[in-house]
C-alpha cells in the first residue's frame, strides 16, 4: 500500500525512494509526490524544484541510477507541499544534431505529462521568465455528482464551434467572466435556446499566445487560435477566471458538468500534428530536450519535416509517441469527461517516420479500438499541409468520422449558382454516399459544414468576394484565396437594401441546407446572428473585434437568429432527416433525389435545382409515415417544381420558403397545402415541406 511506503535514500536534502514507474507525470501520493518521466537517449535526468514563480531552482535532485528502469526515471519525494513548489527537469546526453540528438543540460524541460503549467494565467502578458515553462501538481479531485454524459447518437449531433476567449470576450456578451470557461457557462441558457447539442472548443490545451507575439501597424497580434500546443495534459490557464493554485482545471470540469446536465456534449479540437517548439530556429522547452529524434519526424540529416506548415511534425506512429497520445486522450476522457475529439490536420497521424502515408496507421487503429475511448467521437480533419487529402478515404475502422471538406466546397459553389454541380451537391446533402459507403461507414462519417473557424464567417461568405487580411501583417498573402464566396453585388458592408436582403436569404439558404442534410452538422459560433470578421478569412492572430463575437448583432439580425433556432428544432423534430435507414411502411425509399420534376434526377450542365425527399416511420405518431421534402433553387430566376406524390390521404404542407420573405418560416396554423404538388420556387431560395395525413 502506498501509505506504508518509507524513504530509502536522501537526495539533495530530500527523503526519497524509487517511485511508481507506471505513474506518468507528477502525482500526489501519501507522504509525497511521485515523479516519472521517460528518455531513451539521456544519460542523466535531474528533477528541479522551484519556489512559486522563482527563476532559479531551490533544489536539484539527480535521479540515482537505481531509480531508472529501462528508459524510465521515477522517484517519490517525501515531504513536498504541492502548493509551495513548481518543477521542471534537466536532461544530459549526447549532442549530435546531424542525428537529431540535441541534449542541453542547461535547459529547463517541461514535463510532457504536466497537468498545469505556471506563468500562463494572464492573457497577453509576457512570461516573467520567457521561454521557460514550469509545471505544478494539480489536485484532480472533483465531485461529478450524478451527472452522466449525454451519449448522443453521432447522426443527431448539431455542433457549435467556438473559441473560448472570442465567444464572450467582447463587452456585448454581457457575462461577468469574459473570455473564460466560466463565461461559456454563463451562456448555457443561450446555447439551450439556440438548440445545439454539442460544442466544439478550439484548442484548450496549454498554449502561449505570446509565442508568436508581434506588432503590426500599432495592433498587437497573438497566437490567438491556440494551435501551437505547449503542454497536452494541461488546460489553458488563461481561459480560467479562477487562478487558485493546485486546482487548475476545476473551472473546465464545472463547465463540462453543466453542459452535460443540459444535454450538450463537449468536443475538443486537439493538435497532435505539431508542437510549439517549431523547427531548428524554434524554442526548446520539452520534447526537444527529452528525445528530439523520437518525438519529431526528422530528415536523414536531422532537420525537421514540416507537413504541418508550422515548423515540425510529431512522429505520431513511433510507439513512444503513440502511447503518449493515447495516454493524453484517455486522461481527458476520464478526468474531464470529454465526449469527443476533432483532430487537426489528422492525415499527419497516418504518416510514418519519414512522412510516407500508411495503409493502416497503428495510432489511428489503437485510438479506434481503445476500450477507454470506446464510444468517444473521433473526428478527423482528413488532410494536412503536406498535400495529403483523405476526405472519403481516411483510415476509419468504422470509428472515425471526417470533416467533409467536399461538402463545404461543393455546397458553397452550388448555392451561389455555379454550374455542373447539381449531382455533386445532391450527393453531399444525402450523406455523401459516393464517399462513404452506406453499407460500411455511412453518413455518420460525414461531418457536414459550410463554415468553420478556418475561413469566412457565413455572413462574410455572402459579403466578400476576396479575403481582407491586411491586418494580419502579411500583405494579404495569408489565408485561402479560393473561398467560393459571393458578395451579392458589393464588397463588404453596404446600405443597398436589395443586396442586404439577398445576403440574408443566402445565409438562410445555406443553413437550411445544412440542417436538411444527412450526417452530423457543424457551424461556426456567431453565424446565427451574422457575426462578421470584416472579410478576414484567417483570423488566427486577431485578439480583438475581428475575432470576438459581437452580440449586438443578435438583436440587429433577430430574424436570422430565429430562423436558425427554427431549423435546428425542425431537424430534431423530424428524425428521418438524421436517421432514415429504416424503410417506410408504404415502401417509399428512405432517401430519393429529384430535379424540378418529381422522381427524375437527370441533372444537366445548367441544372441548379435539387429536390430531396426523406421517408420513414414516424417516431411520434404510431402507424403513420413521415415525409420531408427539401428543395433548393440556386438559379437566379423562378423554377416550377413538382414535389413527389404521396400515399393516399397525405398532402404536402409548406414549412419553409425563403423566397417568401419576410414570412419565410410559415407558422403551422398557416401552412400552405400544396394539393397539386407544385410550387413556383423563387430564384435563390429553398423550400421545406412535410407530408402530412389529413
Predicted regions: what they are:
Residues 48, 98-103, 171-175, 203, ...:
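Short, solvent-exposed loop/turn and secondary-structure capping segments
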Residues 202-209, 270-279, 345-350, 380-386, ...:
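Short, solvent-exposed turn/loop segments enriched in Gly/Ser/Thr/Pro and often Arg
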Amino acid at each position: 500500500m502506498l501509505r506504508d511506503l518509507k524513504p530509502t535514500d536522501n537526495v539533495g536534502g530530500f527523503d526519497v525512494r524509487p517511485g511508481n514507474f507506471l505513474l506518468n507525470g507528477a502525482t500526489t501520493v501519501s507522504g509525497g509526490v511521485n515523479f516519472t518521466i521517460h528518455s531513451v537517449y539521456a544519460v542523466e535526468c535531474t528533477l528541479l524544484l522551484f519556489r512559486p514563480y522563482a527563476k532559479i531552482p531551490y533544489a536539484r535532485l539527480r535521479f540515482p541510477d537505481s531509480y531508472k528502469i529501462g528508459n524510465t526515471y521515477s522517484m517519490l519525494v517525501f515531504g513536498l507541499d504541492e502548493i509551495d513548489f513548481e518543477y521542471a527537469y534537466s536532461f544530459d546526453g549526447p549532442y549530435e544534431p546531424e542525428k537529431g540528438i540535441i541534449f542541453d543540460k542547461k535547459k529547463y524541460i517541461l514535463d510532457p505529462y504536466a497537468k498545469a503549467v505556471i506563468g500562463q494565467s494572464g492573457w497577453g502578458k509576457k512570461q516573467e521568465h520567457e521561454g521557460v515553462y514550469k509545471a505544478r501538481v494539480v489536485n484532480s479531485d472533483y465531485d461529478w455528482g450524478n451527472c452522466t454524459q449525454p451519449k448522443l447518437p453521432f447522426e443527431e449531433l448539431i455542433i457549435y464551434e467556438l473559441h473560448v476567449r472570442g465567444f464572450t470576450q467582447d463587452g456585448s456578451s454581457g457575462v461577468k467572466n469574459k473570455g473564460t470557461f466560466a463565461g461559456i457557462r454563463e451562456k448555457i441558457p443561450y446555447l439551450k435556446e439556440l438548440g445545439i447539442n454539442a460544442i466544439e472548443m478550439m484548442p484548450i490545451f496549454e498554449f502561449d499566445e505570446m509565442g508568436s507575439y508581434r506588432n503590426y501597424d500599432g495592433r498587437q497580434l497573438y497566437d490567438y487560435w491556440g494551435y501551437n500546443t505547449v503542454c497536452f495534459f494541461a488546460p489553458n490557464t488563461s481561459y480560467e477566471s479562477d487562478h487558485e493554485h493546485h486546482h487548475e482545471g476545476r473551472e473546465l470540469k464545472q463547465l463540462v458538468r453543466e453542459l452535460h446536465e443540459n444535454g450538450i456534449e463537449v468536443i475538443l479540437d486537439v493538435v497532435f500534428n505539431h508542437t510549439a517548439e517549431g523547427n531548428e530556429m524554434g524554442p526548446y522547452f520539452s520534447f526537444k530536450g527529452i528525445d528530439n529524434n523520437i518525438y519529431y519526424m526528422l530528415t536523414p540529416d536531422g532537420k525537421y519535416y514540416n507537413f504541418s506548415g508550422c515548423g515540425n511534425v510529431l512522429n505520431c506512429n513511433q510507439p513512444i509517441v503513440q502511447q503518449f497520445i493515447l495516454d493524453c486522450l484517455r486522461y481527458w476522457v476520464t478526468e474531464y469527461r470529454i465526449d469527443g475529439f476533432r483532430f487537426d490536420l489528422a492525415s499527419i497521424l497516418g504518416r510514418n517516420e519519414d512522412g510516407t502515408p500508411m495503409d493502416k496507421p497503428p495510432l489511428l487503429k489503437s485510438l479506434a479500438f481503445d476500450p477507454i475511448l470506446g464510444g468517444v467521437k473521433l473526428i478527423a480533419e482528413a488532410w494536412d499541409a503536406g498535400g495529403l487529402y483523405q476526405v472519403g478515404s481516411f483510415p476509419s475502422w468504422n470509428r472515425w468520422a471526417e470533416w467533409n471538406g467536399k461538402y463545404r466546397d461543393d455546397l458553397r459553389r452550388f448555392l451561389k449558382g455555379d454550374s455542373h454541380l447539381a449531382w455533386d451537391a445532391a450527393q453531399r446533402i444525402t450523406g455523401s454516399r459516393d464517399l462513404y459507403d452506406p453499407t460500411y461507414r455511412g453518413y455518420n462519417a460525414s461531418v457536414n459544414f459550410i463554415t468553420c473557424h478556418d475561413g469566412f464567417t457565413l455572413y462574410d461568405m455572402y459579403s466578400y468576394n476576396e479575403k481582407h487580411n491586411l491586418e494580419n501583417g502579411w500583405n494579404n498573402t495569408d489565408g485561402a484565396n479560393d473561398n467560393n464566396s459571393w458578395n451579392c453585388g458589393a464588397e463588404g458592408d453596404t446600405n443597398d437594401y436589395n443586396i442586404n436582403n439577398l445576403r440574408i436569404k443566402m445565409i438562410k439558404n445555406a443553413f437550411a441546407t445544412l440542417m436538411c442534410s444527412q450526417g452530423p452538422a457543424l457551424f461556426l459560433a456567431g453565424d446565427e446572428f451574422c457575426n462578421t470578421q470584416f472579410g478576414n478569412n484567417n483570423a488566427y492572430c486577431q485578439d480583438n473585434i475581428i475575432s470576438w463575437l459581437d452580440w449586438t448583432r443578435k438583436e440587429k439580425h433577430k430574424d436570422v437568429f430565429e430562423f436558425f433556432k427554427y431549423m435546428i428544432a425542425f431537424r430534431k423534430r423530424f428524425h428521418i432527416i438524421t436517421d432514415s435507414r429504416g424503410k417506410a411502411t408504404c415502401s417509399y425509399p428512405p432517401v430519393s433525389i429529384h430535379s424540378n420534376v418529381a422522381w427524375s434526377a437527370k441533372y444537366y450542365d445548367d441544372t441548379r435545382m435539387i429536390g430531396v425527399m426523406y421517408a420513414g416511420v414516424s417516431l411520434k405518431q404510431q402507424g403513420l409515415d413521415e415525409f420531408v421534402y427539401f428543395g433548393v433553387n440556386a438559379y437566379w430566376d423562378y423554377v416550377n417544381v413538382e414535389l413527389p406524390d404521396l400515399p393516399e390521404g397525405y398532402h404536402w404542407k409548406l414549412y419553409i420558403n425563403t423566397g417568401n420573405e419576410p414570412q419565410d418560416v410559415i407558422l403551422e396554423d398557416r401552412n400552405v397545402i400544396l394539393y397539386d404538388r407544385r410550387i413556383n420556387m423563387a430564384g435563390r431560395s429553398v423550400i421545406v415541406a412535410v407530408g402530412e395525413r389529413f
